[in-house]
Amino acid sequence: MTTLNQAHCEACRADAPQVSDEELPVLLKQIPDWNIEVRDGVMQLEKVFLFKNFKFALAFTNAMGEISEAEGHHPGLLTEWGKVTVTWWSHSIKGLHRNDFIMAARTDEVAKDAEGRK
């Protein structure tokens, strides 16, 4: 079985199924420390990454941009002094798709190698 951080995103159309109630806890176990947030009725994955300063936070944001472009799936990114909040959800289905969990796992991989982490 391919782990989430090794998987690739698939095209997600408006008729793609959201992650089921049965799949959700299984997938969440593979991305510890990510939180479920619900905004405007839309379930999202969110995690805050801490850095020593703005420069390191911005570098992480740019690294996230690179992997997001490569996979064709893009997060919400809030870059602040010493902190980046990453939020994943699938806009087309207004909820969570397996792609969001794949990208959350990939985000954790990028964060492991990010310079200036707290």
From Swiss-Prot:
EC class: lyase
This protein's UniProt keywords: Lyase
Gene3D superfamilies membership: Transcriptional coactivator/pterin dehydratase
SUPFAM superfamilies with a match to the protein in the record: PCD-like
This protein's record includes keyword Transmembrane helix: no
Pfam families in alphabetical order: Pterin_4a
Entry EC number(s): 4.2.1.96
Catalysed reactions listed for this entry: (4aS,6R)-4a-hydroxy-L-erythro-5,6,7,8-tetrahydrobiopterin = (6R)-L-erythro-6,7-dihydrobiopterin + H2O
GO terms for MF: 4-alpha-hydroxytetrahydrobiopterin dehydratase activity
InterPro entries (UniProt xref): PCD_sf, Pterin-4-alpha-carb_dehyd, Pterin_deHydtase
Highest taxon in the source lineage: Bacteria
Any one GO biological process: tetrahydrobiopterin biosynthetic process
UniProt cross-references to NCBIfam families, sorted A to Z: PRK00823.1-1
PANTHER family: PTERIN-4-ALPHA-CARBINOLAMINE DEHYDRATASE-RELATED
Family stated for the protein in its record: Belongs to the pterin-4-alpha-carbinolamine dehydratase family.
The name this protein goes by in its record: Putative pterin-4-alpha-carbinolamine dehydratase
